[in-house]
A protein has these predicted regions:
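Interfacial segments at transmembrane-helix termini and the short loops linking adjacent helices
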Residues: 104-121, 305-337
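Helix-loop junctions and terminal segments of transmembrane helices
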Residues: 28-29, 58-74, 249, 254-291, ...
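Membrane-proximal transmembrane or re-entrant/amphipathic helices at the cytosolic face
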Residues: 432-483
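Hydrophobic alpha-helical transmembrane segments
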Residues: 122, 146-194, 212, 363-368, ...
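Membrane-interface junctions at transmembrane-helix termini in multi-pass inner-membrane proteins
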Residues: 126-148, 333-364
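Signature of the first transmembrane helix
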Residues: 4-63, 98, 102, 157, ...
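N-terminal membrane topogenesis motif
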Residues: 1-25, 77-80, 203-219, 281, ...
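Interhelical loop/hinge segments that connect adjacent transmembrane helices in multipass membrane
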Residues: 1-2, 6, 143, 170-177, ...
Length: 483
């Protein structure tokens, strides 16, 4: 089993992130026009409800499984036993979850009225459990994960344009989304025999997993709660139209966040492995570089979403979603906030086995988000939901930075603050000037302004010899010279 370098894994995960970006980028403009805000709102509402059941079945395995597998990846016997123990726990819990879910569809009026949609959406629970994605990430098989995911997304891409034709096709669209995101779980399950030994162990130890899984479970349910409670409350209080506005803005924000956090997904298993083997110098070096990466990448994306919120919404969702513009501008701040909290939480607290603090921070955020939602959504709708989530995310970051204050020198000393500020300032000035003075089609103005925004930003960083950028360029130049 070959373990690739962090750079290779990052490249693969970035390719995966790009594919995750392209799928909604290409399909959502079409789907949003066909299904309308009401149709997309129904799908988002169903998915938010199903997500709660999925996290009960998964029981915190997403991050715990990665860490547990990364720590024993060099011992096939221990890895096989660990995977079987975790998977059996998940399968038992999934059985109970499905019983409750089906009872909900039968007896809850809001679910019963869309029975077909919720039955289809419920497949997400099964696919998530049998997919054992945490194993493949734990042993850093990002090449396999990426290629497999791209194939399934391509099939889903074809299905969207061939099967979603009218406003009543929202249930079919829900199935396609599930197929694209977690449908490959059965392929993972089939390939499992190539990675671990499928046999009975006489000394199964389920108990050792329960406490950390419970901590991760509470964390996950709190995250899902404060993320999806906004959609649920919008649906119950304001109706599907406001859900559609919020969902469109949230989708655009999510694409940006996934780009910024793509490195963190790769580093969790590697950092867990370094700590398990007392390789602290490598641990600190990667954390410093990760912080620089987040600052350099996330800040221009935040500014971009604020400056270009209107054209982004019009191009990606259409004029029916003008109500998404202000929510997107508010949610844009989350790109930077989550970038850093992903670093402090996923890349640091979990490998350091301090996941209880991650749990505390998320529970605090869930309470804050719930209270703000109840206050703001009745009056401000989607905008209020966006503000609530943004404040909740900020509270997570503040708490985690306080817990990890001993690492502040390692994290923040290498960031080129002035170079980034100068680059952003010039990019903003150029973009605003172009928007004011170019008298062309709005789409052309947007494409030109957006392109020059990033060109100016990167150009200033290069001219000012920003260390992180120059290190990457030197490594690329070195590889090209060798070849």
């Amino acid at each position: 089993m070959k373990i690739h370098s962090v750079k290779f894994n990052f490249a693969m995960n970035m390719l995966l992130t790009v594919s995750n970006f392209l799928f909604p980028l290409i399909t959502f403009p079409y789907v949003s026009r066909v299904l309308s805000p009401i149709g997309t709102g129904k799908v988002a509402f169903a998915y938010s409800i199903v997500s709660y059941f999925s996290i009960f079945a998964a029981f915190g395995v997403a991050n715990y499984g990665i860490r547990a597998c990364a720590q024993v990846r060099d011992d096939k016997e221990k890895l096989s036993k660990t995977v079987q123990e975790i998977l059996l726990i998940n399968m038992i819990l999934m059985s109970f979850v499905y019983v409750v879910y089906f009872l909900g569809i039968v007896f809850v009026p809001e679910l019963k009225v869309e029975k077909t949609l919720f039955l289809i959406s419920g497949l997400n629970i099964l696919f998530t459990i049998v997919g054992v994605e945490w194993l493949y990430k734990g042993i850093e098989q990002y090449f396999y994960i990426t290629i497999r995911s791209i194939i399934f997304k391509f099939i889903a891409f074809v299905l969207v344009f061939t099967c979603v034709k009218t406003e009543s096709d929202y249930s079919g669209y829900a199935f396609i989304i599930i197929f694209a995101t977690v449908g490959s779980g059965f392929v993972n399950l089939y390939n499992l025999r190539k990675i671990i030994t499928i046999k009975y162990f006489s000394n199964y130890d389920f108990k050792r997993h329960l406490k950390p899984m419970m901590t991760f479970f509470i964390t996950t349910i709190a995250v899902t709660f404060y993320v999806n409670v906004s959609v649920a409350l919008l649906g119950f209080i304001q109706g599907n139209e406001e859900v559609g506005y919020y969902n469109a803005a949230y989708r655009i924000k999510d694409v940006m966040v996934s780009i910024v956090t793509s490195l963190g997904a790769v580093l969790l298993p590697r950092l867990s492995y370094y700590i398990e083997n007392n390789m602290w110098d490598k641990f600190n070096d990667i954390l410093s570089k990760s912080t620089q990466f987040i600052f350099i990448l996330s800040l221009p994306l935040v500014v971009f979403c604020i400056l270009f919120a209107k054209p982004s919404v019009l191009i990606l969702a259409g004029s029916a979603y003008l109500g998404s513009i202000i929510p997107l501008q508010v949610l844009a701040l989350i790109i930077f906030i989550v970038g850093l909290s992903n670093l402090t939480g996923i890349q640091m607290l979990i490998p350091l086995k301090k996941e209880k603090y991650l749990c505390y921070s998320v529970v605090i955020a869930a309470v804050i988000n719930m209270l703000l939602n109840l206050i703001l959504i009745p009056e401000y709708g989607a905008i209020g939901a966006a503000v609530s989530v943004m404040v909740a995310e900020a509270s997570i970051l503040i708490y985690q930075i306080y817990i990890l204050r001993a690492y502040s020198q390692v994290l923040f000393s290498g960031v080129s603050y002035m170079r980034i500020i100068m680059a952003l300032a010039l990019a903003i000035i150029v973009s605003i000037w172009l928007n004011i003075n170019l008298n062309y089609n709005e789409t052309i103005v947007f494409l030109v302004s957006a392109s020059l925004f990033f060109i100016c930003y990167l150009g200033v960083l290069l001219l000012s010899k920003e260390p992180f950028i120059f290190t990457i360029l030197n490594q690329i130049r070195s590889k090209l010279t060798k070849n």
